[in-house]
Amino acid sequence: RLHKSSKCITFSQKNGRKGYDRANFEKYLFEVMMYAGSASLYQELNSTNKLPKIGDLLIIPGYPGHVVIIIDKKTVKGINYYLFANSWMPAQDIEIISGKNPKCRNFGNYTPILSTNDKIYINGYLFNIKTHLRTW
């Protein structure tokens, strides 16, 4: 069960229905998804002025917003290439994003990011690295 205060949301079983049945699980997921979206994630994580690292997120906050996670990085001749993954809805399978890198086809789905001023287009969303990059 969720308990809301002005600053945070906490979970507990107090006054909640106990059990591991599907209906209870779906109610729990519904509550989590109501509060754990791209807008709250964007606010809770730290911004950075450095180039991305594995595990960092690109977040467009909103309702709906969108999030991609950096799952790998290659550096070749001083250029950083990144591999991204995302999911279209909470609790769906994660997919590796097809990169568009016509200059270096041998890097497959990896996308270059040269500076924090770069903007990259992923799955219909334009991410500004300086604005949208968040780190743990």
Ranges and model annotations:
Residues 1-53, 59-67, 71-72, 80, ...:
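Acidic/His-rich structured neighborhood in mature extracellular/periplasmic domains
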